[in-house]
């Protein structure tokens, strides 16, 4: 159990939730060695499993056009700004940041996304990611605690 909690990358939770929402299975392999991990990867590939990288790109392709359209409504150039926009979008879906206003966690965002943080595209992407997380339930649900505060 302890190994499981340590091994799941939180940055990818939105991809797991998206896959499950579309009826796909999500398989986690906990390998004790590089050789074991390589064998597991080969086995998964031969069974037709999609890699996390492939799933990430497929997910983005599925939402890219509507996001591009929305971004360009104000005369912006999505193709030039896509890298920063996408970083902001994905940052908003992280379990530790979901639903939180940009201003509230700006210092953490600046620390983790120093290359993109100061761009308007990153901020716009973050705002769109927050909205997308709410609309699609890709952000982890918030739970009401007994004290009345909300917690992820």
Language model region names:
Residues 1-152:
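Intrinsically disordered, low-complexity, hydrophilic segments
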């Amino acid at each position: 159990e302890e190994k499981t909690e340590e091994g799941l990358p939180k940055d990818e939770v939105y991809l797991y939730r998206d896959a499950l929402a579309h009826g796909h299975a999500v398989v986690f392999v906990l390998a004790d060695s590089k050789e074991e991990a390589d064998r597991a990867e080969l086995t998964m590939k031969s069974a037709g499993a999609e890699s996390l990288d492939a799933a990430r790109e497929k997910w983005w392709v599925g939402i890219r056009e509507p996001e591009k359209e929305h971004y360009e409504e104000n005369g912006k150039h999505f193709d030039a700004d896509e890298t920063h926009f996408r970083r902001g979008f994905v940052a908003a879906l992280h379990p530790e940041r979901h639903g939180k206003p940009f201003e509230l966690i700006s210092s953490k965002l600046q620390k983790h996304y120093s290359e993109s943080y100061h761009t308007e595209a990153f901020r716009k992407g973050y705002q769109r990611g927050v909205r997308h997380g709410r609309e699609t339930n890709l952000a982890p649900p918030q739970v009401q605690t007994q004290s009345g505060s909300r917690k992820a």
